[in-house]
Amino acid sequence: MPSPNNPTRRLTVLAMLAAVAFVLSWLDSLIPLSGALPGAKLGLANRAVLAGLYRLGPGPGALLCLLKILLATFLFGNAYSFFYSLGGGLLSFVAMALTYRRCSPLFVSLLGGMLHNVGQVLVAMAVLETPGLVAYLPVLLLCGMGAGCAVGLAGGILVARCRRALHGTPDSQEK
């Protein structure tokens, strides 16, 4: 069995997570929440980013986050969505990378979901020069909490699958 630190194995897991993030971004784009709650998304692809952070570490996790943003923007978005996604993604990933060793995946995901919305509102306030957008933040924070919880709970399954791919352990032996 190859070592979990084997560069080829780690690159393979990173590529698989990037593919998962791409498919989940596509599914996320098919779920129309923006009519009811502008700016709200389920953030399904963040499951893959969370798994990458926990299984591969902050460096590969950051690369995965950037790949997810670039792929989703080029295929499903526009120039504006790139900046909103980048602002939210970077802020949330930095917070998740600073807390993932000390906190549960559920908390880390919850924090990431909320800070993603904070980052997007900050970008919107700068781009639109409208400080009043901060009034929409409580609604987006509630959405971020819900999405973060869902991603954190479901992300645990993906983390376990990545552990299995990296270490070759069956799910029943995981703790």
Question: Where on the chain are the PLM-derived regions?
Answer:
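Hydrophobic transmembrane alpha-helices
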Residues: 2-52
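Generic transmembrane alpha-helix motif of multi-pass integral membrane proteins
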Residues: 44-58, 94-99
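Short helix-perturbing small/polar motifs within transmembrane alpha-helices
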Residues: 3, 12-16, 23, 64, ...
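Interfacial aromatic-anchored transmembrane helix boundaries in multi-pass membrane proteins
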Residues: 25-42, 67-96, 105, 125-132, ...
